[in-house]
Amino acid sequence: MTKHLLSIMLVAVCVTACTISYKFNGASIDYNTTKTITINDFPIRAALVYPPLATTFNETLKDAYTRQTRLSLVNSGGDLTLEGEITGYNLTPQAVTEDAYASQTRLTVTVRVRYVDSKNPANDLDRTFSAYRDFPSSSMLTDVQDELITQISQELADLIFNATVGNW
């Protein structure tokens, strides 16, 4: 009886002492050492410029880190730092028909990202990310641009998050 009670108490102590945390976003951050992140605004350095892109992208990227992690966003000196620029904003014809007209147009946004992990420099990253959306050529870009930029910015933020702290 004493051995049985001792075994139960030992299991109870082990279960309460050990915790397993799994996040479906895949974030692999050691919150004991990494507490802050600095995300500098990404300016547009592309030949073709759509001014609302910078604001939409910057806010979406910051939201990705603040909503999916416990990191505090700071203006400078973060344990993690993200910076870069929007290097491409391109429209290309897709799905050319037999009469040599494109039935689809592709909007592609390219971003160069520099990621610095001051606690673990082996995680540092300097990489380019791209995302695109196709839309019917019969639509005016001005009619679909804002929605496409929102979707592309979200995809880019997810790609960057996964490449930096997502451990994917």
Model-derived features: where do they sit?
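Surface-exposed short loop/turn segments
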Residues: 67-71, 79-124, 132-145, 154
